[in-house]
């Protein structure tokens, strides 16, 4: 079938802050306590979306959940009206409260795992909400994400939206950031590759459990290949596979140290897709790869043909990394263009261009079935930019998250977004 891959980017929320909540995420830890700029962050994300729209690519967005996460705090025993719930949590358990203020849902690659219709057992696109069970602040996201995905992809003739797996370490699931699809073209059957973070029973935590990938594949009725991310990459700070590898159609771009069983993975991909192309980079170390987020780039098929890497501007600031980019572009592979974007506010919390988007391949009828409010055109994009300019805070000090004025401003921003979505 003819298929379109849509990038649904997370709209960065008004509570974007640097509270340093994610152990193993070097950027998050390094910038803990810094001043964030929610307005600039959201506009940077929207500018990235516009760059791809201008190239003829279909672009969607996922609205942020309200933060602080009142429903989660209420479920943990803080009573009263919303303001009282927030105030009590801030006073009685500041660490929990900071986790409830996280805007980490911006990283839509962790929202769900998407199984394309040609790969699924029933011919529908399956979206399995990620439980994000390993990190407290991220575990609060799943209920809102499930509800939002059910709104965007409500037509059950074409889409099956699944709730999150049980929120335990045994099924810890961080979504599409640990899933790749190798296929001749987006509309054809492909190989779903699930990358897990540690062998069962090892001393390392399974931020992405193998059992989670197995369950996701069962839910969608998909054949799958499961492989282990290299421990060297994890210890260097690659807390998700998409920090060291990215795939698009028949091409896999990866650091040479990304996988424990590189040969087995490449052999499986080659059996599934005979024209499989592996582009490996061994000219830079894992430290450069992770600090620049070279592999956390979007790899896209352009309407006019060829593929482009959508790279964070940090890749251009490191001469070794940029030399690697030039080598990729000059190589015997379909990647022939680099699109450099500024997503610095997200990068400082550990999320590059690929983290910010959820890829959803759809056929023509399924595309028409998506709620159009969440597909961007010029008018909707301009309306979102104006909304952010008007309502998103200019700056947030992570030490001041307990300020009631900040909660009120964030609530007003979400109210304005709800109003916009009701009319566009």
Swiss-Prot record:
Pfam families: AstB. Substrate binds at residues 19-28, 110, 137-138, 207, 242, 349. Homodimer. Belongs to the succinylarginine dihydrolase family. It is an enzyme of class 3 (hydrolase). Gene3D superfamilies: Succinylarginine dihydrolase. One of its GO terms (molecular function) is N-succinylarginine dihydrolase activity. It comes from the Bacteria. The keyword Cell membrane does not apply. InterPro entries: AstB_sf, SuccinylArg_d-Hdrlase_AstB. NCBIfam families: PRK13281.1 (NF009789). GO terms for biological process: arginine catabolic process to glutamate; arginine catabolic process to succinate. Its EC number is 3.5.3.23. Catalyzes the hydrolysis of N(2)-succinylarginine into N(2)-succinylornithine, ammonia and CO(2). This is N-succinylarginine dihydrolase. The keyword Lipoprotein does not apply. It catalyses: N(2)-succinyl-L-arginine + 2 H2O + 2 H(+) = N(2)-succinyl-L-ornithine + 2 NH4(+) + CO2. Pathway: Amino-acid degradation; L-arginine degradation via AST pathway; L-glutamate and succinate from L-arginine: step 2/5. It comes from Rhizorhabdus wittichii (strain DSM 6014 / CCUG 31198 / JCM 15750 / NBRC 105917 / EY 4224 / RW1). Keywords: Arginine metabolism, Hydrolase. SUPFAM superfamilies: Pentein. The active site is at residues 174, 240, 355.
């Amino acid at each position: 079938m003819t298929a379109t891959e849509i990038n649904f980017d997370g709209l960065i929320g008004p509570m974007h802050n640097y509270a340093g909540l994610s152990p193993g995420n070097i950027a998050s830890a390094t910038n803990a306590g810094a001043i964030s700029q929610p307005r600039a962050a959201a506009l940077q994300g929207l500018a990235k979306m516009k760059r791809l729209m201008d190239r003829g690519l279909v672009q969607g967005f996922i609205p942020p959940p309200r933060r602080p996460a009142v429903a989660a705090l209420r479920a943990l025993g803080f009573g009263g009206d919303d303001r009282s719930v927030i105030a009590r949590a801030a006073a009685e358990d500041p660490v929990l409260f900071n986790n409830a203020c996280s805007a980490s849902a911006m990283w839509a690659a962790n929202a769900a795992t998407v199984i394309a219709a040609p790969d699924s057992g029933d011919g529908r696109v399956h979206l399995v909400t990620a439980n994000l069970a390993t990190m407290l602040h991220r575990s609060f996201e799943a209920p809102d994400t499930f509800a939002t995905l059910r709104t965007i992809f409500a037509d059950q003739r074409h889409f099956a939206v699944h709730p999150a797996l049980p929120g335990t370490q045994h099924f810890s699931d961080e979504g599409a950031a640990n899933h790749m699809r190798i296929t001749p073209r987006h509309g054809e059957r492909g190989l779903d590759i699930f990358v897990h973070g540690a062998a069962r029973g090892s001393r390392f935590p399974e931020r992405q459990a193998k059992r989670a990938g197995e369950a996701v594949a069962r839910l969608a009725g998909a054949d799958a290949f499961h492989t282990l991310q290299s421990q060297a990459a994890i210890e260097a700070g690659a807390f998700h596979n998409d920090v060291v590898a990215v795939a698009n159609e028949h091409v896999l771009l990866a650091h040479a140290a990304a996988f424990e069983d590189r040969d087995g993975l490449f052999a499986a991909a080659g059996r599934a897709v005979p024209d499989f192309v592996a582009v490996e980079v061994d000219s830079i170390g894992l430290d450069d790869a992770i600090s620049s987020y070279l592999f956390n780039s979007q790899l896209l098929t352009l309407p006019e043909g060829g593929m482009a890497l959508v790279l964070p501007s940090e890749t251009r600031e490191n001469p070794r990394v940029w030399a690697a980019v030039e080598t990729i572009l000059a190589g015997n592979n379909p990647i022939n263009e680099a699109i450099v974007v500024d997503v610095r506010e997200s990068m400082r919390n550990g999320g590059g261009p690929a983290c910010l988007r959820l890829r959803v391949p759809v056929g023509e009828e399924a595309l028409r079935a998506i709620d159009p409010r969440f597909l961007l055109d010029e008018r909707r994009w301009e309306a979102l930019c104006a909304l952010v300019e008007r309502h998103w805070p200019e700056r947030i000090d992570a030490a001041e998250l307990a300020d009631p004025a900040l909660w009120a401003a964030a609530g007003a921003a979400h109210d304005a977004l709800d109003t916009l979505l009701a009319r566009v």
